[in-house]
Amino acid sequence: MQIEREIVFPASPDEVWEALTEPERLEEWFATEVELDAQPGGAGVFRWENGEERRAVVREAQPGERLVLDWDDEGEVVLELEEVDGGTRVHVVETAPDWSTALELHALAWTPVA
């Protein structure tokens, strides 16, 4: 099972890429504490206020275009960026074997952005 979502941001693909890959930017909207090496094979650690911690490995990173993370629970998130009139469309596809945790974190993470 997967969750699929599209969001259009009034920013360039490069600006959106920074918000998706730079730890200090991710801490503004996604998780409380972030460590991320946004290159293929790079590691990521995401911590939330509720004490939840998730680890990820960057499978694919094409700056301004596509980011794929493999989560420590065998789930994944694929983010594809596309320049559109007025900004950047981000197409998000998340898959996870344990949807109870994934849905909770999905709600915590994406609600402030949408």
Regions found by a protein language model. Give the residues of each.
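A conserved amphipathic terminal alpha-helix motif
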Residues: 95-114
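Hydrophobic-ligand binding "helix-grip"
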Residues: 34-98
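Hydrophobic ligand-binding cavity/cleft-lining segments
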Residues: 1-35
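Short amphipathic alpha-helical segments with coiled-coil-like heptad repeat character
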Residues: 25-27, 66, 107-108
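Residue-level detection of beta-strand scaffold positions
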Residues: 8, 56-58, 106
